[in-house]
Protein backbone atom coordinates (compact mmCIF):
# COMPACT_ATOMS: atom_id res chain seq x y z
CA UNK A 1 0.00 0.00 0.00
CA UNK A 2 3.00 2.28 0.12
CA UNK A 3 2.58 3.14 3.79
CA UNK A 4 5.98 3.80 5.32
CA UNK A 5 5.08 5.19 8.72
CA UNK A 6 2.10 5.14 11.00
CA UNK A 7 1.48 8.11 13.24
CA UNK A 8 -0.50 8.53 16.42
CA UNK A 9 -3.58 10.68 15.80
CA UNK A 10 -2.85 12.87 18.83
CA UNK A 11 0.60 13.73 17.41
CA UNK A 12 -1.02 15.25 14.32
CA UNK A 13 -3.91 17.18 15.84
CA UNK A 14 -4.96 18.26 19.32
CA UNK A 15 -7.02 15.45 20.80
CA UNK A 16 -7.28 13.10 23.73
CA UNK A 17 -8.14 10.07 21.65
CA UNK A 18 -7.30 7.22 21.51
CA UNK A 19 -5.81 7.81 24.95
CA UNK A 20 -2.47 7.29 26.61
CA UNK A 21 -3.12 3.60 27.32
CA UNK A 22 -3.70 2.68 23.67
CA UNK A 23 -0.97 0.15 22.62
CA UNK A 24 0.09 2.20 19.58
CA UNK A 25 3.78 1.25 19.66
CA UNK A 26 2.94 -2.44 19.74
CA UNK A 27 0.49 -2.15 16.84
CA UNK A 28 2.70 0.12 14.72
CA UNK A 29 5.61 -2.31 15.01
CA UNK A 30 3.63 -5.40 14.02
CA UNK A 31 4.72 -7.07 10.78
CA UNK A 32 1.23 -8.20 9.82
CA UNK A 33 2.45 -11.78 9.49
CA UNK A 34 0.66 -14.61 11.21
CA UNK A 35 2.96 -16.52 13.51
CA UNK A 36 1.06 -19.57 14.69
CA UNK A 37 2.30 -21.41 17.72
CA UNK A 38 3.29 -24.90 16.69
CA UNK A 39 2.12 -26.56 19.88
CA UNK A 40 -0.62 -24.30 21.19
CA UNK A 41 -3.99 -23.39 19.82
CA UNK A 42 -7.24 -25.07 18.93
CA UNK A 43 -6.04 -26.47 15.60
CA UNK A 44 -2.92 -27.98 17.22
CA UNK A 45 -5.19 -29.59 19.81
CA UNK A 46 -7.39 -30.99 17.02
CA UNK A 47 -4.32 -32.32 15.18
CA UNK A 48 -3.03 -34.01 18.34
CA UNK A 49 -6.45 -35.56 19.01
CA UNK A 50 -6.72 -36.84 15.43
CA UNK A 51 -3.36 -38.56 15.78
CA UNK A 52 -4.37 -40.11 19.11
CA UNK A 53 -7.95 -41.13 18.23
CA UNK A 54 -7.31 -42.46 14.74
CA UNK A 55 -3.67 -43.59 14.80
CA UNK A 56 -2.64 -40.90 12.34
CA UNK A 57 0.68 -39.11 12.11
CA UNK A 58 -0.14 -35.63 10.89
CA UNK A 59 2.03 -32.62 11.66
CA UNK A 60 1.16 -30.60 14.75
CA UNK A 61 1.66 -27.14 13.26
CA UNK A 62 -1.54 -25.35 14.36
CA UNK A 63 -2.35 -24.67 10.70
CA UNK A 64 -5.50 -25.91 8.99
CA UNK A 65 -4.41 -27.24 5.63
CA UNK A 66 -4.96 -30.23 3.36
CA UNK A 67 -3.31 -32.67 5.77
CA UNK A 68 -5.62 -31.71 8.64
CA UNK A 69 -8.70 -31.69 6.40
CA UNK A 70 -7.86 -35.14 5.06
CA UNK A 71 -7.34 -36.40 8.63
CA UNK A 72 -10.76 -35.06 9.66
CA UNK A 73 -12.36 -36.87 6.71
CA UNK A 74 -10.54 -40.07 7.75
CA UNK A 75 -11.93 -39.62 11.25
CA UNK A 76 -15.45 -39.17 9.86
CA UNK A 77 -15.07 -42.24 7.63
CA UNK A 78 -13.78 -44.30 10.56
CA UNK A 79 -16.72 -43.26 12.74
CA UNK A 80 -19.29 -43.91 10.01
CA UNK A 81 -17.78 -47.39 9.60
CA UNK A 82 -17.68 -48.12 13.36
CA UNK A 83 -21.05 -46.71 14.29
CA UNK A 84 -23.10 -47.46 11.18
CA UNK A 85 -21.26 -50.26 9.35
CA UNK A 86 -20.74 -48.06 6.30
CA UNK A 87 -17.78 -50.04 4.87
CA UNK A 88 -16.10 -46.88 3.57
CA UNK A 89 -12.52 -46.76 2.41
CA UNK A 90 -10.71 -44.65 5.02
CA UNK A 91 -8.84 -42.61 2.44
CA UNK A 92 -9.49 -39.04 3.57
CA UNK A 93 -11.42 -38.21 0.40
CA UNK A 94 -14.93 -36.87 0.86
CA UNK A 95 -16.44 -38.51 -2.21
CA UNK A 96 -19.80 -39.92 -3.19
CA UNK A 97 -19.64 -42.94 -0.87
CA UNK A 98 -18.77 -40.82 2.17
CA UNK A 99 -21.48 -38.30 1.24
CA UNK A 100 -24.07 -41.07 0.94
CA UNK A 101 -23.04 -42.58 4.30
CA UNK A 102 -23.46 -39.29 6.20
CA UNK A 103 -26.21 -39.18 8.77
CA UNK A 104 -28.16 -36.32 10.33
CA UNK A 105 -26.44 -34.95 13.43
CA UNK A 106 -28.32 -32.51 15.63
CA UNK A 107 -28.49 -30.95 19.05
CA UNK A 108 -28.16 -33.60 21.74
CA UNK A 109 -25.72 -35.77 19.77
CA UNK A 110 -22.54 -36.75 21.59
CA UNK A 111 -19.09 -38.20 20.97
CA UNK A 112 -16.79 -38.55 17.99
CA UNK A 113 -18.86 -37.52 14.97
CA UNK A 114 -19.96 -34.41 16.87
CA UNK A 115 -16.31 -33.79 17.82
CA UNK A 116 -15.33 -34.04 14.13
CA UNK A 117 -18.07 -31.57 13.13
CA UNK A 118 -16.97 -29.16 15.87
CA UNK A 119 -13.34 -29.52 14.81
CA UNK A 120 -14.20 -28.72 11.21
CA UNK A 121 -16.20 -25.67 12.32
CA UNK A 122 -13.21 -24.51 14.37
CA UNK A 123 -10.96 -24.98 11.34
CA UNK A 124 -13.35 -22.85 9.30
CA UNK A 125 -12.98 -20.06 11.88
CA UNK A 126 -15.83 -20.62 14.32
CA UNK A 127 -14.98 -19.93 17.94
CA UNK A 128 -16.50 -22.95 19.65
CA UNK A 129 -15.10 -25.82 21.71
CA UNK A 130 -14.60 -29.35 20.43
CA UNK A 131 -16.06 -31.25 23.38
CA UNK A 132 -18.09 -33.85 21.49
CA UNK A 133 -21.40 -32.47 22.76
CA UNK A 134 -23.78 -30.93 20.21
CA UNK A 135 -25.17 -28.16 22.38
CA UNK A 136 -26.45 -24.62 21.75
CA UNK A 137 -23.04 -23.18 20.75
CA UNK A 138 -22.49 -25.90 18.17
CA UNK A 139 -26.03 -25.53 16.84
CA UNK A 140 -25.54 -21.77 16.51
CA UNK A 141 -22.23 -22.25 14.66
CA UNK A 142 -23.87 -24.80 12.34
CA UNK A 143 -26.72 -22.38 11.57
CA UNK A 144 -24.23 -19.60 10.80
CA UNK A 145 -22.15 -21.95 8.63
CA UNK A 146 -25.31 -22.95 6.77
CA UNK A 147 -26.26 -19.30 6.29
CA UNK A 148 -22.81 -18.42 4.91
CA UNK A 149 -22.99 -21.33 2.49
CA UNK A 150 -26.54 -20.84 1.19
CA UNK A 151 -27.94 -23.90 2.95
CA UNK A 152 -31.18 -24.41 4.86
CA UNK A 153 -30.49 -22.95 8.32
CA UNK A 154 -31.92 -25.72 10.46
CA UNK A 155 -28.92 -26.34 12.73
CA UNK A 156 -28.82 -30.00 11.65
CA UNK A 157 -25.69 -31.37 10.02
CA UNK A 158 -27.07 -33.50 7.21
CA UNK A 159 -25.60 -34.57 3.87
CA UNK A 160 -25.56 -31.07 2.35
CA UNK A 161 -23.94 -29.48 5.40
CA UNK A 162 -21.37 -32.30 5.62
CA UNK A 163 -20.67 -31.78 1.92
CA UNK A 164 -19.99 -28.05 2.36
CA UNK A 165 -17.91 -28.65 5.49
CA UNK A 166 -15.67 -31.29 3.95
CA UNK A 167 -15.41 -30.34 0.25
Tell me what each language-model feature is:
Residues 1-42:
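Basic/polar, cationic surfaces and motifs that engage anionic cell-wall
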Residues 35-42, 48-167:
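Short acidic, glycine/serine/threonine-rich helix-capping segments at coil-helix boundaries
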